[in-house]
């Protein structure tokens, strides 16, 4: 890969709280206030959003709110990720809500259809609900179920209508048909706010789950080695970082802050160490919501992590690490 390209996704259709669509601009403000040239150094692409549909008085699809518009947005994200990779560039995705991750995964698989993908999910939430199990109807809680091709009908609580099911199948088959990811190639890091339906499917599938005490005990270097040993049969790796993985002391400016998360230094070190691996082909940061914040603190903290993560990616690219199709 030759260089980093920023993909800016301002869609917040999958979130339950408004404001994540402004997260990228909050990052830009944090960058300016720090005196950084970060957003001048990299080419960027803005993926179209459909946030205007949020003004509709009666949202359709109660078990997957705005899923029709989300499908349209995700087609654009997947295409942008695929094209970036095919041009030999590293897609660094800055997104509003976490539903975008399904499209990011689909775009990677479209660019590398013969490669096995591993996913490192750094988040407070498991995001493995489906329209059949969701307690909220918010699609940002569903990206991994879509990527894994799961419905989790054994834990069904809802009965979506035919149109919801139609668009859900479209998300599951985005870019190319079938699951993009196998459960054994998914690693949860610091996930700590889950529902019973999610816990049941995680246990059934045996998904690797690294919790906070293990992180504090082992440190980022050892954890990184163990994560990549677990993903040893994966040709490519995608790292998704939700800012609510941070402890709520540092992450008030996000829709769903959760206590007992990562400290800032832990997040910086973990992202840097994970991104040094030459199989990583994409990094994503999501869920910054300045409308819930005080003094843009969340974006300032996230921007510091983003800078450290980007430095690790650039070090790799200077050494010419390339994944061939």
Question: What are the language-model segments listed below?
Answer:
Residues 2-325:
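Conserved alpha-helical scaffold segments that buttress catalytic/binding sites
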């Amino acid at each position: 890969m030759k260089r980093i390209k920023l993909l800016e996704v301002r869609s917040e259709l999958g979130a339950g709280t408004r404001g994540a669509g402004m997260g990228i601009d909050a990052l830009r403000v944090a960058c300016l206030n720090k005196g950084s040239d970060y957003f001048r150094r990299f080419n960027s692409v803005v993926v179209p959003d459909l946030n205007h549909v949020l003004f509709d008085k009666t949202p359709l699809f109660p078990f997957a709110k705005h899923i029709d518009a989300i499908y349209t947005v995700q087609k654009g994200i997947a295409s942008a990720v695929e094209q970036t990779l095919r041009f030999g560039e590293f897609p660094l995705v800055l997104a509003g809500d976490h539903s975008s991750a399904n499209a990011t995964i689909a775009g990677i698989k479209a660019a590398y259809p013969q490669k096995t993908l591993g996913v490192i999910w750094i988040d407070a939430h498991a995001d493995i609900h489906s329209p059949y199990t969701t307690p909220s109807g918010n699609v940002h809680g569903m990206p991994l179920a879509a990527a894994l091709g799961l419905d989790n009908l054994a834990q069904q609580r809802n009965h979506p209508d035919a149109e919801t099911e139609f668009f859900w199948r479209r998300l599951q088959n985005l870019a190319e048909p079938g699951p993009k990811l196998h459960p054994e190639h998914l690693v949860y890091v610091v996930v700590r706010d889950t529902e019973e339906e999610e816990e049941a499917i995680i246990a059934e599938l045996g998904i690797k789950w690294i919790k906070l005490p293990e992180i504090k005990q082992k440190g980022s270097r050892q954890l990184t080695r163990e994560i990549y040993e677990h993903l040893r049969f994966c040709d490519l790796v995608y790292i998704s970082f939700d800012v609510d993985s941070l402890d709520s002391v540092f992450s008030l400016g996000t829709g769903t802050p959760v206590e007992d998360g990562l400290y800032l230094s832990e997040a910086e070190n973990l992202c840097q160490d994970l991104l040094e691996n030459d199989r990583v082909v994409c990094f994503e940061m999501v869920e910054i919501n300045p409308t819930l914040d005080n003094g843009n603190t969340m974006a300032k903290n996230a921007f510091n992590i983003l800078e450290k993560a980007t430095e690790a990616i650039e070090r790799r690219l200077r050494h010419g690490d390339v994944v061939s199709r």
